[in-house]
A protein has these predicted regions:
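Residues lining hydrophobic/aromatic ligand-binding pockets adjacent to catalytic sites
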Residues: 18-36, 42-71, 107-116, 124, ...
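Acidic, His- and aromatic-enriched active-site or binding-groove loops in soluble protein domains
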Residues: 1, 35, 56-94
């Protein structure tokens, strides 16, 4: 996953600066992890079709991830892979904000009707997407872990267990 190097709003002000920052971030990811990012994420998931066209023109990304906002999607689901208008190859991955926010903000809220959130319960929610999508994109900021959800909430154990619980279900 790549983004702007300085977590900036450079796309809004200078496309040259924007491309330069992305290139710098790609270099950093490659240096530290030995990987070339294939998905782009703009600062705070800010998106428009012009951004997608610029990202596609860079020819180094397969997809871009952004919000799955209800007011934009209307009747459509964030749980499908879309193609940005005007793009031929770039895919658009939409954040499932409801399931993401269940982890990021509601996980340790004892007043939440679904508390406690366990890995097996969450895996069933993910599996329930079947028939209304073929992908669930969960996206949480790093501040989820340590600022919103402290270690003593069980968030780390939940995150370790979740993939295995999802894969246990036959439809996944």
């Amino acid at each position: 996953l790549a983004e702007t190097y300085y977590h900036s709003l450079s796309f809004l002000y200078s496309h040259d600066e924007f491309v330069e920052q992305i290139s710098k971030h790609i270099e950093a990811i490659n240096y530290f992890f030995g990987q070339r990012p294939r998905v782009f994420r703009n600062t705070e998931l800010i998106y428009n079709n012009d951004l997608a066209a610029l990202i596609e023109s860079m020819k180094c990304f397969d997809a871009i991830i952004t919000e799955g906002a209800d007011h934009i999607l209307g009747y459509r689901s964030p749980n499908f892979v879309y193609q940005p208008k005007g793009c031929e190859n770039l895919k658009l991955l939409l954040k499932n904000y409801s399931l993401s926010d269940d982890i990021a903000f509601r996980f340790s809220n004892r007043d939440w009707p679904q508390w406690p959130l366990t890995a097996d319960k969450f895996s069933r929610w993910v599996s329930n997407v079947n028939g209304n999508g073929n992908v669930v994109n969960l996206f949480m900021d790093y501040e989820t872990f340590g600022e919103h959800q402290w270690e003593d909430t069980g968030i780390s154990s939940f995150m370790r267990a979740m993939p295995g619980e999802i894969l246990k279900l036959a439809d996944n």
